[in-house]
């Protein structure tokens, strides 16, 4: 949430409004998002990010992004949200320290070790729990809060009623996706990409196999035919813009 000054019934008051966070795959898109009103932008670096299919940001790009964003009173969140394997540990500490030195406002993380390391290093930046951890209830949110995180990004599977109920019970910052892909396998807990294309979804290689078109068979009989729309496991995107006033 962010505080803004508004005139209501002839009086100037401070009200809280949700922060509008947008993704960006390169510097041009980042600048457009901020100039058109985004309060913050989340981006992926060359390492430790699930956004590996995007062009992504070098450390020099991230520094330029931070300088541009801060000039326009916006924030930069960097995704460090892969699930770490042993060969991903090398260079992680140095990378986090560099992001902090550059002035990044927050990192978005999914692996518990990155949460722990960020706190151990006493970084100035915030630590946000990624939607990849499928957080859906108050007890889980309090667990992460006790670990010292600053924000929890809800699982996209949470419906409006649960979102409203949880918001009333916890004080920590909450973030929720209102537009974009709806992962059919609970926020990336999926092995389809590994199986079909040998690309690890939880290390940034998701080939979006759930969006491919499939023919359905029962034994030798095809259940969908050419005149029917091909079957896809994830054919819809989220679109909650009309729900924002709530």
Regions found by a protein language model. Give the residues of each.
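Conserved nucleotide-cofactor-binding alpha/beta core module
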Residues: 137-139
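Active-site pocket-lining/capping segments in soluble small-molecule metabolic enzymes
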Residues: 2-135, 154, 162-246
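Conserved glycine-bearing catalytic or ligand-binding loops at nucleotide- and phosphate-handling centers
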Residues: 151
């Amino acid at each position: 949430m962010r505080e803004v000054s508004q005139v209501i019934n002839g009086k100037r008051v401070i009200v809280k409004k949700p922060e509008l966070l947008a993704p960006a795959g390169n510097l041009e898109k980042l600048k457009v998002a901020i100039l058109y009103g985004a309060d913050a932008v989340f981006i992926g670096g060359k390492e430790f990010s699930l956004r590996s299919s995007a062009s992504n940001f070098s450390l020099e790009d991230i520094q330029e992004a931070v300088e541009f964003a801060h000039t326009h009173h916006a924030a930069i969140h960097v995704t460090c949200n892969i699930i770490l394997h042993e060969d991903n540990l090398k260079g992680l500490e140095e990378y986090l320290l560099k992001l902090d030195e550059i002035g990044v406002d927050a990192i978005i993380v999914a692996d518990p070790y990155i949460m722990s390391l960020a706190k151990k290093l006493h970084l100035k930046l915030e630590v946000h729990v990624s939607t990849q951890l499928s957080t859906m209830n108050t007890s889980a949110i309090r667990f992460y809060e006790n670990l010292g995180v600053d924000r929890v990004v809800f699982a996209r599977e949470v419906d409006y009623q649960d979102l409203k109920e949880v918001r009333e019970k916890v004080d920590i910052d909450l973030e929720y996706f209102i537009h974009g892909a709806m992962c059919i396998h609970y926020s990336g807990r999926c092995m389809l990409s590994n199986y079909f294309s040998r690309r690890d979804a939880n290390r940034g290689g998701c080939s979006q196999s759930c969006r491919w078109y499939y023919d359905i068979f029962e034994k030798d009989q095809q259940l969908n035919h050419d005149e029917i729309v091909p079957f896809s496991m994830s054919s819809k995107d989220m679109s909650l813009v009309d729900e924002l006033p709530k």
